[in-house]
């Protein structure tokens, strides 16, 4: 389980810095995929 809750929060905050980016699921998922 390399992706702990804290790491996940970091990924989300880094990949989806704004509410609009969070709502942009495609962009958010792409950022998470690139991180992992």
Swiss-Prot record:
It is found in: Secreted. Keywords: Calcium, Cleavage on pair of basic residues, Disulfide bond, Hydrolase, Lipid degradation, Lipid metabolism, Metal-binding, Secreted, Zymogen. It comes from Hemiscorpius lepturus (Scorpion). GO terms for molecular function: metal ion binding; phospholipase A2 activity. One of its GO terms (cellular component) is extracellular region. Its cofactor is Ca(2+). It comes from the Eukaryota. The keyword Secreted applies. Its EC number is 3.1.1.4. It catalyses: a 1,2-diacyl-sn-glycero-3-phosphocholine + H2O = a 1-acyl-sn-glycero-3-phosphocholine + a fatty acid + H(+). This is Phospholipase A2 hemilipin-2.
């Amino acid at each position: 389980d390399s992706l702990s809750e804290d790491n996940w929060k970091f990924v989300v905050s880094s990949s989806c810095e704004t509410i609009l980016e969070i709502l942009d699921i495609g962009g958010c998922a792409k950022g998470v995929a690139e991180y992992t």
